[in-house]
Swiss-Prot record:
Keyword Ubl conjugation: no
Organism: Shigella flexneri serotype 5b (strain 8401)
Source superkingdom: Bacteria
InterPro entries: CyaY (IPR047584), Frataxin/CyaY (IPR002908), Frataxin/CyaY_sf (IPR036524), Frataxin_CS (IPR020895)
Function: Involved in iron-sulfur (Fe-S) cluster assembly. May act as a regulator of Fe-S biogenesis.
Gene: cyaY
One Pfam family it belongs to: Frataxin_Cyay
UniProt protein name: Iron-sulfur cluster assembly protein CyaY
Gene Ontology terms describing biological process: iron-sulfur cluster assembly
One MF term in the entry's GO annotations: ferrous iron binding
Keyword Cell inner membrane set for record: no
Entry GO terms, CC: cytosol
Length: 106
């Protein structure tokens, strides 16, 4: 994967997250902001999830209250380089915990 393809795929990931949050019908207020390649999800209780791209490594990094994870693209899924879990699984787990209600991105 070259840098432009990486950025295209990361942009697509950001857009999907933003669209899912805009379309959700939950009780809690969840905001999403993109600034300089960093996506910040802010929850009603003030907690945050930070997602950023690491261009030199072609990775997506996820930082939550539970810790940080690094993801490599394998096939059509972003996979954690430590646990083998998918980006969507870990993001949903963290968002659900931080929101205090089920949050789905799929």
């Amino acid at each position: 994967m070259n840098d432009s393809e990486f950025h295209r795929l990361a942009d697509q990931l950001w857009l999907t997250i933003e669209e899912r949050l805009d379309d959700r019908d939950g009780d809690s207020d969840i905001d999403c902001e993109i600034n300089g390649g960093v996506l910040t999800i802010t929850f009603e209780n003030g907690s945050k999830i930070i997602i950023n791209r690491q261009e030199p490594l072609h990775q997506v990094w996820l930082a939550t209250k539970q810790g940080g994870s690094h993801f490599d693209l394998k096939g059509d899924e972003w996979i954690c380089d430590r646990s083998g879990e998918t980006f969507w699984d870990l993001l949903e787990q963290a968002a659900t915990q931080q929101a205090g209600e089920t949050v789905s991105f799929r």
